[in-house]
Amino acid sequence: MEIKEEGTSEEGQHFLPAAQANDPEDIQFTSIQKSPNEPQLEFILACKDLVAPVSDRKLNTVVQVSVIHPVEQTLTRYSSTEIVEGTKDPLFLTGVTFPSDYPIYEETRIKLTVYDVKDKPHDTIRTSVLPEHKDPPPEVARSFLGCASFKVGELLKSKEQLLSLSLRTSDGGKVVGTIEVSLVKMGEIEDGDTDHITTDVQGQKCALVYDSTAPESLSGKENLPFMNAVLRNPVCKLYRFPTSDNKWMRIREQMSESILSFHIPKELISLHIKEDLCRNQELKELGDLSPHWDNLRNNVLSHCDQMVTMYQDILTELSKETGSSFKSSSSKGEKTLEFVPINLHLQRMQVHSPHLKDALYDVITVGAPAAHFQGFKNGGLRKLLHRFETERRNTGYQFIYYSPENTAKAKEVLSSINQLQPLVATHADLLLTSASQHSPDSLRSSLKLLSEKTELFVHAFKDQLVRSALLALYTARPGGILRKPPSPKVSTEEKSSQHDSPQQLRRQDSIPHHSDYDEEEWDRVWANVGKSLNCIIAKVDKLIERDSRNDKSTGGDSSKDGDADPNLEDSLTSHPREDWYEQLHPLILTLKECMAEVVNRAKQSLTFVLLQELAYSLPQCLMLTLRRDIVFSQALAGLVCGFIIKLHTSLHDPGFLQQLHTVGLIVQYEGLLSTYSDEIGMLEDMAVGISDLRKVAFKITEATSNDVLPVLTGRREHYVVEVKLPATVFESLPLQIKEGQLLHVYPVLFNVGINEQQTLAERFGDVSLQESINQENFELVQEYYSIFMEKMPPDYISHFQEQNDLKGLLDNLHQNIQAKKRKNVEIMWLAATICRKLNGIRFTCCKSAKDRTSMSVTLEQCSILRDEHQLHKDFFIRALDCMRREGCRIENVLKNIKCRRYAFNMLQLMAFPKCYRPPEGTYGKADT
């Protein structure tokens, strides 16, 4: 039967068309039995006794792997091994792996084609781009040696799970050697030395917990919806490398997209729209203002309405991206995708070595959070915010100056008001419900909750900012009169007087005293809430006391209470069996009315504070808000993805869970941006975006449906991410987490530029931005370490210190930061090591997370294999080249620019540290 070739160009691991996976004919295929979320099939290759076309030539061998579907008989080029030089018996370190959702069956045929590469540096493009039945074009400089094929079922059912196949020439005649195919199951021990292939294979599930063997339940079906809601389109690679004692270790490399790339930005933009609409409504409800302030308000509202419309348009466009989980580097300048992180992926390395526990290492790779569409002509957020604040403080203008801290405080108090007022009202209603049931125990419980929430409500207004804001609003009223709706319970007279025109206010760091303004009037209004609560407490105490006396009495007179309030006593004696509801209802109404009065005044005054920030340099202020929202959205999407992955892989680690709710998690970002040209602005954006992640907290809840996507709540000053877990998993969590305790993160950023632009910055420019960022974030790491050592249990700390010398690592990191050495990449290595030892979440970022990021994560993976898993020292460079040439990161490049070349040239690479240079033949000019 003729085999038709799938026409492809620059392809990697890709899926057959749906029609092939679901054949229209009713032919039944035999599925491969596997564990959930595990690759369906993995095997490794070796050749023996290859015959060279020319007798004196040493072969440089590569194997191309293709898939032949059993019905369509179409051939799909799938992957290839690395090139092994100078031997007729090549043993390949790069294996072949088929992901869990790849349409492969026992009837599927695998074709293996062996080539001799004559000019390795020019063999840049994977063999999959070549026509299957034709000799390679002359410019590729490689020749066909032989091919063989087998059915998947033959390998699975083979006695030793090993096939030894004869390699034949294209006409099927001459035998040119043998190729051995060995089935691999991660978790098995591969016996024997590294100079030959072994076939002793037994079944075992792979580990999914960092540095420990995964519990069985972690791979169970209850977690499938959880992980499938986060990860998409996995790319898997398989390697085997020798250890220092000549044993084999197996490594599975996986790269997955995340649906959170689009889900989190959409959630966040929806919250921004809701918050901004609420703020605009609050501005409208400020009441009468003098002409100057009223004009400013109208101008602000006009611009803010335009912002809301723009956010709504962006959300509409993003909502059209249904099912999207990836934004390519070539799309980083698209306006409709501004809020979406660039090239976000989970990069995972799973290691099984003969003498150590299975281990898992995760890094989130993502483009540096930055506003690419906005551009970097005037710098990034760090510079723009500083300049904006300096101008507000030092330039004369007709507004009232509030510091960023006071503005943030105003937003915080407004948020507390919006949260606490409905809570107090709810608990007040519950108190009335308990009263109607005439249940003393229920009444006491309801009163306790009402008291707690009301005290929090009252405490929120203690800040001096509220007082100064009330006076500021007073001066902004027509004629300087503070006008307010009448209070139902507390009546006060407002003195009116003429005041100087507000146009005369200039560069005021505080509100001037106004002789006609009654500062104590606010205290009286505010105190009425507490007094109302005290009346309710006293009434409840009397009702319960009276009820207790009635229970003890057999119908006689109640005992005398000389200290009782006469009014309350009259009420009690007039109701032998009191109607508690009727007696408490008026007091509850009073409490609610007093609260409404306080809320009305406070919200108006604090909204006036926010008006000052918006009114000054209005377009610039809103553009800064937009830019900050964009950068934060990109950073938040990556953080949520990293948190969920870390949580999933550590669910059965008691130490991690205790650290999570006791201390929180450190989140370490490795930046590779230069401090030159546009990348300075990107780094300035990134620094602010990562710092803003401190206002994010996580809460874990039990999933009540199959929808386990995280839910975002809050406003710009504070966000809570609700992470849902399946019921069986949720029940195993510590009580503090199950009760909804907020879980905090400590984001830190260390940046070291490594490219040719950084060379220019170091010799002719300025690297102070990088130095400042590294020093500031080192202090944050020290702070986290101190909290960690203080709050974690002594027995845990004792064991932790035995296993890790964190203090030595921190001292070394500090010395390297102070050294001011050019391209000191040891800063990044030390920061990454500290993060891993502290159970943190690792990120690696460059401009687009494609080229420099690929060099960094592959170097990190091989360094871990060397330092933690005894990778043979002679194989370090070869392992590094394997991962960079044939691993997941070259697939990432292909996904982004449709070309399998890292975007470096020879001159650029001369400026790179040697360990960050890709192997020859994998880089060059790419048509993106």
Curated annotation (Swiss-Prot):
Record-linked InterPro entries: C2_dom (IPR000008), C2_domain_sf (IPR035892), INPP4 (IPR039034)
Residues of the C2 domain: 23-165
Keywords tagged on the record: Hydrolase, Lipid metabolism
Pathway(s): Signal transduction; phosphatidylinositol signaling pathway
GO terms for MF: inositol-1,3,4-trisphosphate 4-phosphatase activity; inositol-3,4-bisphosphate 4-phosphatase activity; lipid binding; phosphatidylinositol bisphosphate phosphatase activity; phosphatidylinositol trisphosphate phosphatase activity; phosphatidylinositol-3,4-bisphosphate 4-phosphatase activity
EC number from the UniProt entry: 3.1.3.66
UniProt-listed CDD domains: C2A_Copine
Segments of skewed composition (Basic and acidic residues): 1-13, 506-516, 548-563
PROSITE patterns the UniProt entry points to: C2
Family statement drawn from the similarity comment of this UniProt entry: Belongs to the inositol 3,4-bisphosphate 4-phosphatase family.
Function: Catalyzes the hydrolysis of the 4-position phosphate of phosphatidylinositol 3,4-bisphosphate, inositol 1,3,4-trisphosphate and inositol 3,4-bisphosphate. Plays a role in the late stages of macropinocytosis by dephosphorylating phosphatidylinositol 3,4-bisphosphate in membrane ruffles. The lipid phosphatase activity is critical for tumor suppressor function. Antagonizes the PI3K-AKT/PKB signaling pathway by dephosphorylating phosphoinositides and thereby modulating cell cycle progression and cell survival.
Name of the protein in question: Type II inositol 3,4-bisphosphate 4-phosphatase
Encoding gene per record: Inpp4b
